[in-house]
Design a protein with these regions (language model features):
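Glycine/proline-enriched, intrinsically flexible loops and inter-domain linkers
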Residues: 1-663
Length: 663
């Protein structure tokens, strides 16, 4: 490639290190290009080979998860979201992703853009979002910084979701010292589409036009993917410009324009510009289609003066899409987006050479092989060193007999203390900031239902959806904790009257270069896989968020599960936890071989009343769990159950108390 006249910094190994690349990765890049990269090319490689985009430290482990099922219409990771056939010619697109690092430095915008980004993943596939969920983790509420983060995150989720017009119907909030300084903000979206009317994130057809549509591009979010691929430190506050800024009203326009364009048949391929922006969408679409692209990025609508091609390619400005369409459909495509008062600018066209070529006022500033950049192609894949953490010997050696017995006189005060602990207490302050009823499809929302139930209009069917994970269990027993995370999410869906179909996941862990962290990661994923196979809930995709650490240490390993279930008849089968009538019989449904065990390890009782995180996760057998869930679902469908509530945080005492309170 000829030298450019554009004034860019000379690329050196030291500059590559500053971009988060290792010495080996820099050497691979130079070898593949056959020359020293340009500054723009370095930026492209650094974000595409970041952990956030390449999954280089996790993909080998993720491939061990069950990723096939009769109802799955696309494989895990093949599209922007998972797609599940629910019958009657309908499919559900759903996905969960993290926005942890942005929310740690700018909680309002970090959380808001997390909501916006996951919605785009859904409607980019042609599905209309029908509900949102979230899963949140914070440090103790007596810390002013934690209260600031908590308030900002909840307001960000509420303001964006409410303005966008999709109900936030379910979620979970946990507090623990391990999350202090590094909150977890996981956002999930669910949408419905007719089978056969979906769009794909692919670039095909030599000569087809490539358009950028939606908002103008600014400097917000540059290197956001790289920022998400490193530990949070005192220097992270200086990376506030790496946090994107969202506009839910523009996103609403983009939703309608995108769905109209897909229905009009003018879209060959389309992808949201999320992490790494134009770089990621152009490279991934090209690689998937075995094609290339020629992009003239000076044509990108810009909202800031003096932007460089490096900045334009790496910007993560929100509410933007990359669209491929046939030349004969360009006028229609432009008319649709302009009708919705959105930009639609032609950047170039699809080529057959497999390379993404970036031009700046006619000058070639980047020429990179798409396949070499992407996950599943030439992006690095690492198998990290593992070591069983020493702390597990200490926690496993804990003797529950050292915990004082609870006197009868102290039982009621202890229950009240449990009910008042932040992890069990009502989250009404949170969900009252969310519009849970917009679009009028919410049958069971936050509060008395173990999972949310959302009606599919024009059908008797509904969707039961839930996010769930007990990070304390995973910390104490990673494999069993991973199993329980899947099982409890499925159990919640069953308690609401739904049949679990599939999961999406958001795997929140510490630094993968630490052998103990990677051992826990592999064990937890192994447990998840075992539970998914046993319960028949394949993995449709999701997200890995590493580097959730701060100067005080790593967060609890938190593999958040987003569970999708189908309620065959929302009027007859939807079930809540609230007791319905005096005189109803209260039963504890359990395996036939069940016996009482002193399962206080990792319990909220130990944590809230004794300040302890110790012992083993509760006794758990997958076959028994499956039998209980199948039995309960059968009883609900037979009309024999008036309410159902799973026994989890706080045990049977809290379970019964909550059913009374909900009544």
């Amino acid at each position: 490639m000829a030298a450019t006249t554009l004034q860019e910094p000379p690329v050196t190994l030291e500059l590559a290190r500053e971009h988060g690349m290792t010495d080996e990765e820099y050497a691979w890049m130079v070898e593949k290009l056959g020359r020293t990269p340009t500054f723009t090319e370095l930026g492209i490689y650094s974000v595409m080979w970041s952990e956030h985009c390449s999954y280089k430290n996790s993909i080998a482990v993720l491939k061990t998860l069950p990723r096939e099922g009769d109802a799955l219409l696309v494989g895990a990771g093949e599209e922007n979201a998972g797609l599940v056939d629910i019958g009657d010619g309908l499919a559900v697109a759903f996905k969960i992703e993290s926005h942890n690092h942005p929310s740690a430095v700018e909680p309002y915008q970090g959380a808001a853009t997390g909501v916006g980004g996951i919605q785009r993943d859904i409607f980019t596939m042609g599905a209309r979002p029908i509900c949102s969920l979230n899963s949140l983790r914070f440090g103790p509420l007596d810390n002013p910084r934690v209260r600031y983060l908590f308030d900002g995150v909840v307001r960000g989720i509420g303001d964006y979701g409410n303005s966008f017009g999709v109900p936030t119907v379910a979620g979970e909030v946990y507090f623990d010292p391990s999350y202090e300084g590094n909150p977890l903000v996981n956002a999930m979206s669910v949408g419905v589409v007719k089978v056969g009317q979906t769009a794909s994130a692919i670039a095909t057809g030599v000569g087809n036009a490539v358009y950028i549509v939606g908002s103008a591009t600014g400097r917000d979010g540059i290197h956001g993917a790289t920022f998400a691929s490193e530990e949070i430190s005192e220097a992270s506050e200086a990376k506030r410009p790496s946090v994107q800024v969202g506009d839910p009203f523009t996103e609403k326009l983009l939703l309608e324009a995108t769905l109209e364009a897909i229905r009009a048949g003018v879209v060959v391929g389309i992808q949201d510009m999320g992490a790494a922006g134009l770089t990621c969408s152009s490279c991934e679409m090209s690689a998937k289609g075995g094609a290339g692209m020629e992009l003239h990025v000076d044509r990108v609508p810009q909202r800031e003066a003096g932007m460089t091609p490096y900045e334009i390619m790496l910007s993560e400005s929100q509410e933007r899409m990359l669209v491929v369409c046939k030349p004969e459909h360009e006028e229609t495509l432009r008319a649709i987006f302009e009708k919705w008062d959105l930009h639609a600018a032609r950047l170039g066209h699809v080529t057959d050479d497999g390379r993404v070529k970036v031009y700046w006022h006619g000058e070639l500033v980047a020429d990179v092989p798409a396949e070499h950049l992407v996950l599943g192609g030439g992006a690095p894949v690492y198998h990290r060193e593992t070591r069983r953490p020493a702390y597990l010997d200490q926690t496993a050696a804990f003797d529950l007999a050292t915990v004082p017995d609870l006197d009868v006189a102290d039982a009621a005060p202890a229950l009240l203390q449990l009910l008042g602990s932040p992890n069990i207490a009502s989250k009404r302050w949170v969900f009252e900031q969310y519009d849970t009823m917009v679009r009028t499809n919410t049958v069971a929302g936050p509060g008395p239902s173990d999972a949310a139930v959302v009606r599919i209009k024009g059908s008797r069917k509904g969707l039961a959806v839930k996010t769930d994970c007990n990070g304390r269990y995973v910390y104490l027993n990673p494999r069993k904790g991973g199993q329980i995370a899947v099982a409890e999410a499925a159990r919640n869906v069953v308690c609401a009257g739904g049949k679990p179909l599939a999961i999406t996941n958001c795997l929140n862990f510490g630094n993968p270069y630490k052998p103990e962290v990677y051992w826990v990661f592999k064990e937890a994923v192994g447990g998840m896989g075992e539970a998914c196979r046993a319960l028949g809930t394949p993995v449709t995709g999701g997200n890995v968020s590493f580097y959730n650490e701060n100067p005080t240490g790593a967060v609890f390993p938190t593999p958040t599960i987003g569970m999708l279930g189908l309620v065959e008849d929302v009027e007859r089968h939807t079930t809540t936890a609230a007791f319905q009538a005096e005189g109803d019989v209260i039963l504890l449904l359990s395996p036939a071989a069940w016996q009482h065990r002193n399962d206080l390890g990792g319990s909220e009782y130990l944590a809230a009343l004794h300040g302890l995180t110790a012992g083993d996760a509760p006794h758990f057998v997958l076959d028994e769990e499956k039998a209980v869930q199948e039995a309960l679902l059968g009883l609900i469908r037979a009309g024999l159950v008036r309410s159902a509530h799973d026994v989890s945080d706080g045990g049977l005492a809290v379970c019964l108390a909550e059913s009374v309170i909900f009544s």
